[in-house]
């Protein structure tokens, strides 16, 4: 049976890791990815609607993202939403589809993206350490109240530390993969 402290720590750390992976997936890297459009909303009949719910998004060629709306009347709305975003891309509307051509990023731009990815991962590490601190505090409180023997508390502290180290190592791996993806061009 898994101890409730370990279970809680593992679940919270796992959610943190998933959140960081999701943030990194949405990050622009110079390589076309439909995920970067997930945050862009189009005012569709008065409802802010994500682009991926209004169109098919695919990668065409090496540096082009193609957005093909199911309803052609939203083409200009999608174009306007992309222009208003902070993506820094110029949509090309040919009347049927919108093309987003990703220019080759400069070395300086890539280094900026790597720095941003590192900041995101560092935030994740801080969150993991805060989870550790929170769980260790609960263990100490239970120990003081006599609910957990000292030996068990020490064992739990060691297990929580191992879990923390494991998740921080996973965050480092995620960062290295993202860094490689950014610098690959």
Curated annotation (Swiss-Prot):
What InterPro entries has UniProt attached to this entry?
A: Ribosome_recyc_fac (IPR002661), Ribosome_recyc_fac_dom (IPR023584), RRF_sf (IPR036191)
Q: Which GO terms label this protein's molecular function in UniProt?
A: ribosomal large subunit binding
Q: What is its main location?
A: cytoplasm
Q: State the UniProt keywords alphabetically.
A: Cytoplasm, Protein biosynthesis
Q: Where in the cell is it found?
A: Cytoplasm
Mind telling me which GO cellular component terms the entry cites?
A: cytoplasm
**GO terms for biological process, alphabetical:** translation; translational termination
Record keywords: Cytoplasm included? yes
| NCBIfam families recorded | frr (TIGR00496)
Provide the family line.
Belongs to the RRF family.
Report the protein's function: Responsible for the release of ribosomes from messenger RNA at the termination of protein biosynthesis. May increase the efficiency of translation by recycling ribosomes from one round of translation to another.
Name of this protein:
Ribosome-recycling factor
Give the source lineage, highest ranks first: Bacteria, Thermotogati, Thermotogota, Thermotogae, Thermotogales
């Amino acid at each position: 049976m898994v101890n409730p402290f370990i279970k809680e720590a593992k679940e919270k750390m796992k959610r943190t890791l998933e959140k960081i992976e999701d943030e990194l997936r949405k990050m622009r890297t110079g390589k076309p990815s439909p995920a970067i459009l997930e945050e862009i909303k189009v005012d569709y009949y008065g409802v802010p609607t994500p682009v991926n719910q209004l169109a098919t998004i695919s990668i065409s060629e090496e540096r082009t993202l193609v957005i093909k709306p199911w309803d052609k009347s939203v083409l200009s709305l999608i174009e306007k939403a992309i222009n208003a975003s902070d993506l820094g891309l110029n949509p090309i509307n040919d009347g049927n589809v919108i093309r987003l051509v990703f220019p080759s990023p400069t070395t300086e731009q890539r280094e900026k993206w790597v720095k941003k990815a590192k900041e995101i991962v560092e935030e994740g590490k801080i969150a993991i350490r805060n989870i550790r601190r929170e769980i260790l505090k609960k263990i100490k409180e239970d120990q003081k109240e006599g609910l957990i023997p000292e030996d068990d508390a020490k064992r739990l502290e060691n297990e929580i530390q191992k879990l923390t180290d494991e998740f921080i190592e996973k965050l480092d791996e995620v960062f290295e993969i993202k860094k490689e993806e950014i610098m690959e061009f």
